[in-house]
């Protein structure tokens, strides 16, 4: 399982010279594209709930969903697509009354920050020529939501057949981002929020909204983990304060 990223109260307030022992812990399995935003939300939550602790496991939604299916101790699941939430829901592994869409996102084409290209007409497909002997960096369309959205969009634009054999397939969307950050790929397809948090890439095009299903992030409490602490953090996730943070990171409010 992915190493859990811990947001601990002691670390958050160490600068003030004192700490509290956590009396409750909520484990959140969340799509990799939400890493920065959810960590900030958890920090803000900890300020209001100093005796609570939130820990994260960030990875591809498909990887996390299958870990939940295998019994991983997740209290809350945040997916980057309806597909993987539905996957767990149909297996009766979610608390259905808590299922809802948290935020949305956009799909974008990125290039290294130092690239001479600043914008492209995504529909014309001339940008594909710049790949030359290199690859287009994407989350693996076989299981990564960002890659599946990318395949859908490129198919709609009649470009998929031109690039399907020239893909660098990341294990998640942050893996796809990393290749472009290191300039190991001239272009990549990620979410707008991923591009926004990186100074090593720039957005050169936004895929038309009608070229793919809406990018949404459903959230739910995992069955067997419906308790007061899980409910409390989920309620905070849906609060105006949390939504403000998420929107600040580039997500769209729902």
UniProtKB/Swiss-Prot annotation:
Gene3D superfamilies: Periplasmic binding protein-like II (3.40.190.10). Keywords: Metal-binding, Molybdenum, Periplasm, Signal, Transport, Tungsten. InterPro entries: ModA, ModA/WtpA. GO terms for cellular component: outer membrane-bounded periplasmic space. GO terms for molecular function: metal ion binding; molybdate ion binding. Pfam families: SBP_bac_11. Molybdate binds at residues 33, 61, 146, 173, 191. It is found in: Periplasm. CDD domains: PBP2_EcModA. Residues 1-24 form the signal peptide. One of its GO terms (biological process) is molybdate ion transport. Its main location: periplasm. The complex is composed of two ATP-binding proteins (ModC), two transmembrane proteins (ModB) and a solute-binding protein (ModA). Involved in the transport of molybdenum into the cell. Belongs to the bacterial solute-binding protein ModA family. This is Molybdate-binding protein ModA. It comes from Haemophilus influenzae (strain ATCC 51907 / DSM 11121 / KW20 / Rd).
């Amino acid at each position: 399982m992915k190493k859990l990223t811990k947001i601990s109260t002691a670390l958050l307030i160490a600068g003030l010279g004192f700490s509290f022992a956590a009396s409750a812990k909520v484990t959140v399995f969340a799509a990799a594209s939400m890493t920065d935003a959810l960590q900030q939300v958890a920090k803000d939550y900890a300020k209001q709930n100093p005796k609570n602790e939130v820990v994260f496991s960030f990875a591809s939604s498909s990887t996390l969903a299958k870990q939940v299916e295998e019994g991983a101790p997740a209290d809350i699941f945040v997916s980057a697509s309806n597909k993987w939430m539905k996957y767990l829901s149909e297996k009766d592994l979610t608390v259905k009354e808590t299922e809802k869409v948290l935020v949305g996102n956009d799909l974008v084409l990125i290039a290294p920050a130092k690239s001479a290209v600043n914008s492209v007409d995504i529909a014309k497909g001339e940008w594909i020529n710049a790949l030359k002997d290199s690859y287009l960096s994407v989350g693996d369309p076989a299981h990564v939501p960002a890659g599946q959205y990318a395949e859908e969009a490129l198919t709609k634009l009649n470009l998929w057949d031109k690039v399907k054999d020239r893909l660098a397939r990341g294990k998640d969307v942050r893996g796809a981002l990393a290749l472009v950050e290191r300039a190991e790929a001239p272009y990549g397809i990620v979410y707008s929020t991923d591009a926004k948090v990186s100074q090593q890439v720039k957005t050169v095009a936004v895929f038309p909204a009608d070229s793919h299903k809406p990018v949404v992030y459903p959230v739910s409490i995992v069955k067997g983990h419906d308790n007061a602490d899980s409910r409390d953090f989920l309620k905070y996730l849906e609060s105006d304060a949390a939504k403000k943070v998420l929107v600040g990171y580039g997500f769209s409010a729902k």
